[in-house]
């Protein structure tokens, strides 16, 4: 009887260990199935060319976007303001240049974000125009490699910041260049502290985005911001994140499947990216 009891006890213990092992394996398997965020990837929502053709319908929520990065730029459904993501928070620069935090359930038709890791940094000063800043950044790109993606932060004081946002559009949507002719609003601030977030796309991306630099700004006090048209850097810290990966989420909007994306939109993109 004693031997039987010992055997039964051992069998019960073995069964419990086996069950625990299976439970642990299942837990580990579930953990392995959960994808880790790739910090070396630029995540893009839709094509810029889809936005410029007038597909302002959101396809990804703010909450979902924050799972893909902590730094980036974009816009909101109906181009309802300029999107600036800094340190994991998504801000909207409204049509009057003021800033608000975007709610998690708001949807996004176009954006680029990444998890920012500083690969290079330096202090800069006396960069008196956006052209001079782009020239400085282009020199960095030439050294590091022009066929990669770059997300940049410029944190500091600006003698001048000139930016734009736009009025929310209503359906039926017009192409972006046409909408901005009447609904773009511009603002200027002097001696303002804040952060410029800039994205660089290689030349081969010209059919999916705008090749070169695209800059947005949010003030340090999170009161003002927009799409940067001109600037004058007093003193700032420049930080560069070099990124090799690219992941684009095509939208599931009603409009996107029938858009003529073969059309050359380079002129329209230049119009919407620069000061008219």
Language-model region placement:
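A hydrophobic, small-residue-rich beta->alpha segment in the mid-to-C-terminal subdomain
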Residues: 219-261
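Bacterial signal peptide processing site
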Residues: 21-23
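Positively charged n-region of N-terminal signal peptides that target proteins for export
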Residues: 1-5
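N-terminal low-complexity or amphipathic/hydrophobic leaders
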Residues: 46-111
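C-terminal motif of bacterial Sec signal peptides marking the signal peptidase cleavage site
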Residues: 16-19
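A glycine-rich, hydrophobic loop/mini-helix early in the fold
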Residues: 93-140, 144
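Long, positively charged binding patches that form subdomain-scale interaction surfaces
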Residues: 135-199, 206-208
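Intrinsically disordered, low-complexity terminal/linker regions enriched in Pro/Ser/Gly
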Residues: 55-59, 81-84, 243-276
